[in-house]
Amino acid sequence: MATTNTTNTGAILKELYSLPPVRVLRDKSFLHDKLAKEKPTMDFSGRYAYFPVTLQRNLGRGSRGDAGNLPVAGTETIDDAKVYIKRHYYALEWSEAIEVASKNKEGAFENVVTMKMKNVAIDMAKEANRQLYNASQGRLGTITAGAASVTQTLDSVQYIFVGDSVDFITANGQTNTGTRAVTGVDRTASTITVATVTTTTNDFVVLEGNFAVSGTGGESYEVEGLRHIAAEDRTLHTIDSTTYEEWDGNATAMGGNPAGESTFEQLYDDIGSRQRGDMDHYLTTRGIRRRLADEFASQRRYLNEKAVDIKAGYSAIEVNSKPCIIDDDCPKKTVFGLTLDTLKVMEAIKPGFLETEAGDGAVVELKDSSTAGQKVAVWQSWYRYHWTLACLDPGRNGVLTGCADEAN
């Protein structure tokens, strides 16, 4: 006798989708939100903003005897710091058919166009958060063992994901040796998988199109971030700190050693000893902050013999009364000591959609066909954010690099 079951009657059964769609991405953008939303941004127009910086005091000084010759007059050294605007974009594309199919709740969980336009703002903030931590040249990672191979080994793969299209740039910034799609990332081995490309040690990887090679060392279209700001012996905002040491940040290499309380205090003192004010925040990774918490826990003393309600973990970590905060986009093995008032997000235009060529306020347009004069049933749109990061006083910021931490 034939038994009626869910298999042979599947055509009359319904599928119930009662749960909402879920986005399981790493969307938190702490530093960007802190600087752009909690701190005043600075609006400007033009190619760049600049501000005068006094880099050396008047040296026309001296102590003399009775009726001695007075010192020869000196003057302060003042230079213009130039902060160039950076232009950032996200491209969106969807078919006209999917727009119609998802127009109401009967057809889709969510309208596809609404979803894409909502998500792109989150994605742009996340990308901005990554760039706030940039070293020079917008590097995603540096090749540590050059090879002609599908597998490339980097110092870090923290900011690289499957699907990224990346350029391989020679160490001198003069040659792009190939554009490749990333098909695999091994965060333990710190390698990426791409179509075969030939690299040399110290070559570096950037997002496709974000670096323009040239015979003079090339130009990054990304922001000069905290790793560059807190470094020493570098050019920041067109001022060379090898000439003017007061323009240096405060950098200490840890050589793989743990960053303990004493090291945090050293960073605090390095910044404070510049005599321009103390820092106000530590910013680091989960692994480094956890090690710091473990050090504090090992030193804990319970003076109340009746204390029995002991809870694990911690709610806040402070060193020298300054909060130690985690940001998952902070580079691994790194601790920053920051003075947030010295960091300014400079906006030429707020995040928003680029208007179409028609100039009628529209933000979407039909895609051009490969045949001249024809269109295809696909909509296109671009989200833009023209901004950069300015540091008014790099000496009030610092960094510990190469700290003991988790893997990439």
What are these regions, as identified by a protein language model?
Residues 1-62, 74-408:
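Core alpha/beta structural scaffold of self-assembling particle/tube/pore-forming proteins
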